[in-house]
Amino acid sequence: DKGSVVFRGSAIDTLSAHKRARLGIGYVPQGRDVFPRMSVLENLAIGEEISGKRAPKDRLDQIFSFFPILAERRDQRAGTMSGGQQQQLAIGRVLMGAPSLILLDEPSEGIQPNIVQDIARIMVELNRATGVTVVFVEQNIDMIRAMASRAYVMDKGRITNELSLIHI
């Protein structure tokens, strides 16, 4: 069986990652994938470049308001940051392109519990403040409870169950 991925009425499964980004889809992979030898600011600039859109001057300030640690560490190499800080940087990099959809793959992986809760809270705030849709794949039930407005169980690429939030 084969399906397709449709975004705003168009199939996107054959598009390259940078073309998807230019359509307004931001992707934060499992394991974060920051550029370890580049500074926080350089990593954030990559997000703007990938999106193909010039970010307004206040975009950086907005990201720093959601993730203050990035402002404090703006000149630090990303590879020397903790896992939670790198996750915040990866999300910030995606936000530089002002996506309408953010895909997060296992955002809690390898991150201490208090930072997981901070990231969950910030993602909910981002959704409310900017209207960005956040779709995430996650096994951490606490993060799911904190972030989800809908939940689906998948097995081998198929949705097997839809759960109401009171049953999570």
Regions found by a protein language model. Give the residues of each.
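H-loop/switch region of ABC-family ATPase nucleotide-binding domains
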Residues: 138-139
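Conserved ABC ATPase signature
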Residues: 77-81
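Catalytic Walker B motif of ABC-type/P-loop ATPase nucleotide-binding domains
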Residues: 102-106
